[in-house]
Amino acid sequence: MVMLDLLSNALIQIKNAEAMGKRQVAIWPVNKLIYYTLRVLQRHGYVGEVEYIDDGRGGKYVVQLLGKINDIGPIKPRYPVKYREIVQWEQKFLPARQIGILVISTNQGVMSHVEAKEKKIGGVLLAYVY
């Protein structure tokens, strides 16, 4: 089986585990983009500890779930967004103001839309969570 989008696969694994009421989920295969996205989710309190386990086959992340995710998913296609356009995308993907985050890949790293607005930079939309 060929996995074309590892980030999308990881987010769907988290969504399914949350729906089943699991306390943790193992995500594999992994890459740096998944790690940085998980760190953003961790900083905003959507997931707990993220642990990397090297199993000799590329490794995997074990993510502690806190039960705070109502919906999570990738944004496809990955739209480029300017600093001033972030509010429009917020309205499109998030249920209300101040609820949830958009994950954005910028030239200064992967961050939430809140951090991107504070730094006044744009990037590419990766995912949403609330």
From Swiss-Prot:
Could you list this entry's UniProt keywords, alphabetically sorted.
Ribonucleoprotein, Ribosomal protein, RNA-binding, rRNA-binding
Entry GO MF terms: rRNA binding; structural constituent of ribosome
This protein's GO CC annotations: ribonucleoprotein complex; ribosome
**Superkingdom assignment:** Archaea
Q: Name one GO biological process term.
A: translation
Give the family per the record.
Belongs to the universal ribosomal protein uS8 family.
How is the subunit organization of this protein annotated in UniProt? Part of the 30S ribosomal subunit.
Q: What does this protein do?
A: One of the primary rRNA binding proteins, it binds directly to 16S rRNA central domain where it helps coordinate assembly of the platform of the 30S subunit.
User: What protein am I looking at?
Assistant: Small ribosomal subunit protein uS8
Q: What is the lineage of its organism?
A: Archaea, Thermoproteota, Thermoprotei, Thermoproteales, Thermoproteaceae
